[in-house]
Every structure is written in C-alpha cells, then in structure tokens.
Amino acid sequence: EVHIVTKDDLELIYGGLDKLKSISVGQVSASENLQARIDIDHFVNRHCAILGSTGSGKSNTVSIILEAIATRKDKDNYDIKSTRILLIDPHGEYGGILKEYSQIFKVNADTSKLEKELLIPYWALPFQEFIKSFPGKISEKQEEYIREEVLQRKIKSSKYLTVIPSETAITADSPIPFSINQLWFDLDDFERQTFKERGQPETKTLNTSSQGNPNALKSNKYTPAGNGGASPFMNNSAQGILGFLTLMRNRLLDQRFKFLYELGNLKPDLEGKITGDLDALIEDWIGTEKPITILDLSSVPSEIMG
C-alpha cells in the first residue's frame, strides 16, 4: 500500500521542536510550508562542523544560523539581549553579511564603518605563540633561555596585578603583562657585552656616551672584542641569539604588527605596569550592543597566520 506523505506526516518527522528552544534555518525541501529547525541547546553545547566543497554555500549557511540565533525572540516576542556570539573571521567574509547584527574588530579598522581596532596583547599569548610571532629560528636551548627570561619578568611584574598570584602558579604562559621592549633590550645587551678582564662582568666596556634605549629599541654599544685573545674579551656566556634579536627588533618596528605590540593602554611600561587590562578588553569584545562580535583577521599579516 502506498500513501502520499502529508504535511502532518512531515511535521511528525521534522517538527516537534519548541519554537522558543530552537531556531529556524529555512524550509524543509519536501514541504515549503514546513520550517527546518535546530535545537539551540543541542547545537551550541556540542562541537559542530559545516562541511562542503568550494562554492557549496558553507559561509552562507553559517551566516543564516548566526542570524537566526541573533534574532531569537522570547515568549513575549522581545529580543533576547543576552545572546553573545564571538566569531573569528580569518578571511573577512562575515562583516558585510552580518553587519546589522555585529560589531567588527579589525586590524586597521575603518572607523567610518563603525569598525573598532583589533588588539591582541602579546603578553597574553602562550609562550610558544609569542615566540612564533617573530621570524628566525633558534635552538631548543635558546628557546628555553628566552622562556626563562619571560617567566622572570612575569613574576616580577605580577606585583602590579590587582590579585597577586603565588610565584609557583606563574608560568611563561600566564597572561601577565611584561615589557617586550625591556626584554629585547636586556637580551640584546647581554649578547653584545665585552669585558676588559676575561670573565669579569664588572669590567664591561660600555660606551657611556652612546647608551641604548629600550623604548627606542636602541642597543647599548661596547668596545669590540680584541683579536688574538687580546682585551676586550667576549661574553662567553652569550647565547648566540643576536641574529634572532635583530629580526625581533625589525618585527617590533614593523607597523603591520602594531595590533600585537603597540597596544595603547594595554602596552606595559618598562616595569611591566599597564593602565588597562584583559577584563576591559574582553568586555569591549563581548559587551557591545550587538549580539555578534566579529574578530576580522583578514588584515593580519600572513607571516603569523599559519
């Protein structure tokens, strides 16, 4: 026996979801009058992937789902103000599609379009991500040396935090402000030192008339090491990272990376003190009047987008 499937039959198969607890993302192809709905709790509390070949409409599908979530109504047909969606947009695809419902944070923001500048504090990155933000290769031993230097600076500047953590709880991954200028300057200075007496740091040959400046990323100058074992003597404890530090300095001066290193009130002074903090940054990201916050990474330099 063959029966025609009715709308009521399709409702039993595809329907049954509470409208207040679900979102509509279109119509079921078998019946244009039947909404395709997704249980919102099941959807957002689980990992979800939208897959398809190039040009199949993945971005459009994501936009439809996000718009449906952003425009949900409560039982009295009012907007649900607590909706908060954080969208990481590597290719700048969603700002135009979702502009009515979103606040965009972008590198080199266009304020005429009400975009806000995207800032990502270097000191809040895990150490591995921090060190990978600079070009050049270093050995595992050299990396551990820099990790320890970062750790010590975070421990030192933690005293400026509102709630001071114990030293044992702090790691190089802890999101504690420290001065990247001072880190570079100290590492660079140690590599360049020469001594009048072999192995005697107190006999450094620092040129006092041409001292460096960490804020300007200007190195200290020392008398070059002598030839044939003559004074001045090289610093035998140097780690051999001067080439890496030169590349690091170039990256810090590169204005394309100001979103990472030039941070306004989130950039620490040489002691590690800041006037802003992460709580204000996060509040700025998710405390907007719009339900969707888009972090547009399309202008982030490709060198660090791997």
Predicted regions and their residues:
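Charged, amphipathic alpha-helical linker segments immediately N-terminal to NTP-binding catalytic cores
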Residues: 1-27, 39
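A generic secondary-structure signal marking the coil-to-beta-strand transition
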Residues: 21, 34, 291-293
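Glycine-rich phosphate-binding loop of nucleotide-binding enzymes
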Residues: 24-108
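Glycine- and other small-residue-rich loops at beta-strand/loop junctions that grip anionic moieties
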Residues: 39, 119, 298
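Flexible, glycine/proline-enriched loop segments at strand-loop-helix junctions
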Residues: 53-56, 117, 133-134
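P-loop NTPase motor domains
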Residues: 92-98, 102, 122-306
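Conserved AAA+ ATPase "SRH/arginine-finger" region at the nucleotide-binding site
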Residues: 107-111, 120-124
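Conserved P-loop NTPase catalytic core
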Residues: 109-116, 130
